[in-house]
Design a protein with these regions (language model features):
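Repetitive helical segments and hydrophobic/amphipathic motifs
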Residues: 11-12
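Acidic, polar-rich low-complexity tracts and alpha-helical solenoid repeat scaffolds
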Residues: 2, 6, 17-252
Length: 252
């Protein structure tokens, strides 16, 4: 009796295992691809990966192999496994360089690094890699509809790097190293034009001039800065410093 029970259990396990396996098997590459895409749309990341991977195993010579490879990258992004996503997208570029998915794959490599980029108080390796990948995308595919998005990402990432330098400039000023603060701030303005950090650096330069008793120069800089599109926090600091400088000038 025990033997029959064990045999029955084994058979049941095999059956359920087979059913689970068959759940992610399809009869054609088209059916695989359609199911994989639906899984992605529904946010079912792991099933999508299984479907695309099984498709590549079952139909390695299919006209949809590059689509499946791209799908693997998307599934990894869906799971927020960005290093895996980078690997899958790079594999597509290496094995299917003329695939219609190649431009988007290159963009998504940059996006995967972007999603890993950390704040200014941590290592910026992923930030630099994301800038490199988005820049390469813009150079390789200048007519892509995603160029605008890539440039926006580049600006945001450069701003992150610059904000770290702004923090250093503020610290130099706080510690009394006026010349170092000025040099840091001027380098930010030159290297990262058009960023929030560049505007913050201009404010640092105005503060340096106040410290150096160049009140009129500071007021001129603050007046120009006030005409820019500033974030509320920076705008408040500019107004407060402007009022202080004006009062100090009136005392002379």
């Amino acid at each position: 009796m025990k033997r029959f029970l064990i045999v029955g259990c084994v058979a049941l396990l095999a059956l359920t295992g087979g059913c689970a396996q068959n759940k992610y098997r399809r009869e054609s590459p088209e059916a695989y691809y359609e199911s994989g895409q639906k899984a992605l749309r529904d946010g079912k990341c792991y099933p999508a990966e299984l479907l695309f991977r099984n498709m590549l195993m079952d139909f390695p010579g299919s006209h949809l192999t590059d689509d499946a490879q791209f799908g693997l990258g998307q599934a990894a992004q869906c799971r927020e496994e960005y290093l895996v996503a980078i690997f899958e997208f790079e594999r597509l570029l290496n094995e299917y360089p003329v695939s219609p998915h190649a431009p988007v794959a290159r963009f998504q490599i940059g996006e995967s690094y972007y999603q890993q980029a950390r704040d200014i108080h941590h290592d910026q390796d992923e930030t630099n890699k994301a800038i490199q990948e988005f820049t390469r995308f813009v150079e390789d595919y200048p007519r892509s509809d995603l160029v605008g998005d890539a440039n926006a990402r580049i600006l945001d990432l450069k701003n992150r790097l610059a904000l770290k330098d702004v923090e250093i400039a503020h610290n130099y000023l706080k510690w009394g190293y006026v010349t170092s603060a000025k040099l840091y701030a001027e380098a930010i303005v030159e290297k990262f034009p058009g960023t929030e950090a560049a505007l913050e650096a201009q404010y640092v330069i105005a503060r340096v001039k106040v410290k150096s008793k160049d009140l009129q120069g500071a007021l001129n800089d603050l007046t120009l800065l006030a005409g820019q599109d500033l974030l509320p926090k920076l705008k408040k600091k500019v107004i407060e410093l402007t009022v202080k400088v004006q009062k100090d000038l009136q005392k002379k």
